[in-house]
Regions:
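Short glycine-rich loop/turn motifs that provide flexible caps or phosphate-binding loops at active sites
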Residues: 19, 104-107
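Residue-level recognition of conserved structural "scaffold" positions that shape functional pockets
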Residues: 27, 33, 58, 113-115
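Canonical Radical SAM [4Fe-4S] cluster-binding loop centered on the CxxxCxxC motif
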Residues: 39-86
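Short loop/turn motifs at secondary-structure junctions
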Residues: 67, 98-99
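Canonical radical SAM enzyme core domain
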Residues: 77-93, 108-142
């Protein structure tokens, strides 16, 4: 269980990286007693969205259109480079110990990133839980 004490906004949050269980206290008073008031904000985000994908393999191939999915990211025509592993590691290094999760996204299925396994591993090595949503079009038995 990871625990974070936000002294500025006077509350405590805890997160279990194995199960995803998350809990936080209400704002505590000057005596350390929970007031029951929901904290408005935290000093550092507990979940951060990181766009690691610059293009969509499935969108560019027309697979999404064939399956009846309309792409809101214009995946059929847009092609930018994916975030480098080096840049991703810099983000993780800046966030470790301050955030619980990174929501991986961008333009395309994150599981198609050329460094997907390394991205997941680096997050876990630094006690940050990676999460992502995928169309599943690129999933294999592995």
């Amino acid at each position: 269980m990871l625990k974070k004490v936000d002294r500025k906004n006077r509350f405590v949050s805890m997160f279990d990286p194995k199960t995803g269980f998350y809990v936080r206290s209400g704002v505590y008073d000057e005596n350390g007693k929970d007031t029951g008031i929901d904290p408005f904000m935290t000093q550092f985000p507990e979940l951060i969205d990181v766009g690691v994908m610059g293009h969509c393999v499935h969108g560019a191939s027309g697979l999404c259109l064939k399956s009846g999915v309309q792409c809101y990211q214009n995946g059929l025509k847009t092609h930018h480079p994916n975030m480098t592993l080096e840049n991703f590691k810099r983000i993780v290094d800046e966030c470790k110990g301050k955030t619980f999760q990174l929501a991986l996204g961008g333009r395309g299925d994150v599981d198609q990133h050329e460094n997907f396994a390394e991205i997941l591993q680096y997050c876990r090595e630094n006690n940050i839980v990676p999460n992502f949503t995928s169309s599943g079009l690129g999933f294999t038995e592995d």
